[in-house]
Design a protein with these regions (language model features):
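Residue-level signature of tetratricopeptide-repeat
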Residues: 189-190
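Residues in the helix-turn-helix
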Residues: 182
Length: 255
């Protein structure tokens, strides 16, 4: 793997003046060319050796510089456009040198932000989301309190409700609480029966989230994201999380 480390060349040169993006992309291109050439040779010669059979990966440091999550995801999306790029990893910045004024004064690594970026990355790779949808110009930073799929749904209430008995697979993937496996089971199961709340739970749909974004026979009218409004749905879904955090913060430590 060849690590990009810093998401923009400007900040890369600020922290490492001897480096630039050309010195990073050159070996990336070399690896890509080798992988593609090896694949072509294997179509002609069965036992031709493989070149980097696992493909490429890279890593970016999150929180060391001022890039937004949108900047990071747009770069990741471009990297995934390369035919041999398999994974982009995100590593929260861990402060170890408090005397370097070029680095932010953080008490700890931004682990929640790192986790949200991995969730957004998953949406791009497996759920058909584009980077510009997950972090748009109005909201360039991911919401740390809710996952990026739910955040997108709350920003786009006009997309909902999704009829689980009629919607295509791609639309189902955009519903909070419905994953890839659940979406596939919905598509296959509804050929033989009309899906209800109970059958959706059995399939594995997280109804606590999905109920505000879907329509099916048993759901009460007026309880969707458009009737309740996104702000209220957000409060309903984050209230249990806040209560858990409050309980944890109220616990005494041993030392």
């Amino acid at each position: 793997s060849v690590n990009i480390e810093i998401p923009t060349e400007r900040n890369l040169q600020l922290l490492a003046p001897d480096k630039n993006y050309e010195s990073i992309y050159r070996p990336m291109s070399y690896i890509q060319q080798g992988v593609l050439q090896s694949a072509e040779e294997r179509t002609r010669f069965r036992h031709a050796p493989r070149f980097a059979p696992a493909g490429q990966s890279t890593q970016m440091i999150v929180g060391a510089t001022d890039e937004s999550d949108r900047d990071i995801l747009l770069l990741s999306s471009a990297l995934y456009g390369r035919p041999t790029m398999k994974r982009v990893y995100y590593s929260g910045f861990i402060p170890v040198n408090p005397y370097d004024k070029r680095l932010p004064a953080l008490d700890k690594a931004p682990l929640v932000r790192e986790n949200r970026l991995y969730q957004a990355d998953w949406l791009m790779r497996f759920y058909g989301f584009r980077a510009e949808e997950i972090a748009d110009e109005q909201t360039p930073r991911l919401d740390l309190d809710i996952d990026p799929k739910l955040a997108w749904a709350l920003r786009n209430p006009a997309f909902f409700p999704v009829d689980v008995n009629r919607a295509d697979y791609e639309a189902l993937l955009r519903v909070p609480g419905i994953g890839g496996k659940s979406a596939r089971l919905i598509v296959s199961s509804r050929r033989y029966r009309t899906l209800t709340q109970q059958s959706l739970r059995q399939i594995g749909v997280v109804m606590k989230k999905a109920q505000y974004f879907i329509s099916c026979r048993e759901l009460t009218a007026g309880q969707g994201v458009n009737e309740l409004r996104p702000e209220q749905v957000r409060r309903l879904l984050t209230a249990p999380q806040r209560r858990r955090q409050d309980r944890n913060e109220g616990q005494l430590t041993l030392f």
